[in-house]
């Protein structure tokens, strides 16, 4: 089972962003069997260039649910699923970032349709979602909105599944994303390091 998703964010400093919209389509390989689409109040300002790109502004999100209010639904709809996204590294990072703020370690296997497309559909000048689906004749509406991009990714992924007849390429591109508790602790410590140039002393207590 697959959870095909797209996330829109506030933009801004790396790992200081917030999710503004999320769309998840639960896909059994043939059809969508469940879906979740929601605006999200990121509790931080959206960068102006992102407003221009997505059309999502701060006023639209003022009364939207905060991430903790939709977190349970996200866990439930993705439980036992492989997360699929166009540039999955970004979407998965954003989910993990929001869950980490809640003190929850969110882990799922992931597949990236950018990487899969380059292997199964070689020869295109661009593998951006908009240009790729246009070249493939896949309709896309509401570009740069979560539901429109995620639904186009569903159609693209179905095409990729059909191309990979023995599923060997998809299997070889599956990322397990299992992070040990020790590594998670180190990542948190690294994130807390100051950005200023200087000499720092590390003590092992």
State where each predicted segment sits.
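Conserved non-catalytic scaffold segment of RNase H-like nuclease domains
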Residues: 1-108, 122-144
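Extended, hydrophobic interaction surfaces within ordered domains
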Residues: 57, 68, 112-175
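GIY-YIG nuclease catalytic motif and its immediate N-terminal context
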Residues: 151-205
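Structured loop/turn residues at beta-strand edges in well-structured enzyme cores
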Residues: 104, 111, 195
């Amino acid at each position: 089972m697959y959870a095909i998703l797209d996330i829109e964010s506030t933009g801004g400093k790396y790992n200081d962003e917030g999710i503004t919209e999320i769309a998840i389509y639960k896909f059994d390989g043939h059809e969508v069997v469940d879906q979740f689409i929601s605006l999200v109040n990121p509790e931080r300002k959206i960068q102006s260039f992102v407003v221009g790109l997505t059309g999502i502004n701060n006023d639209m999100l003022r009364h939207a649910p905060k991430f903790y209010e939709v977190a349970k639904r996200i866990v439930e709809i993705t439980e036992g699923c492989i997360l699929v996204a166009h540039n999955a590294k970004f979407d998965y990072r954003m989910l993990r970032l929001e869950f980490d703020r809640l003190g929850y370690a969110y882990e799922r296997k992931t597949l990236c349709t950018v990487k899969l497309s380059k292997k199964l559909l070689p020869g295109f000048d661009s593998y951006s979602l908009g240009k790729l689906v246009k070249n493939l004749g896949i309709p896309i509406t509401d570009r740069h909105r979560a539901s429109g991009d995620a639904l186009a990714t569903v159609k693209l992924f179905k095409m990729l599944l059909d191309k990979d007849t023995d599923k060997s390429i998809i299997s070889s591109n599956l990322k397990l994303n299992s992070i040990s508790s020790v590594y998670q602790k180190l990542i948190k410590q690294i994130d807390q390091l100051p950005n200023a140039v200087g000499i720092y002393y590390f003590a092992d207590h």
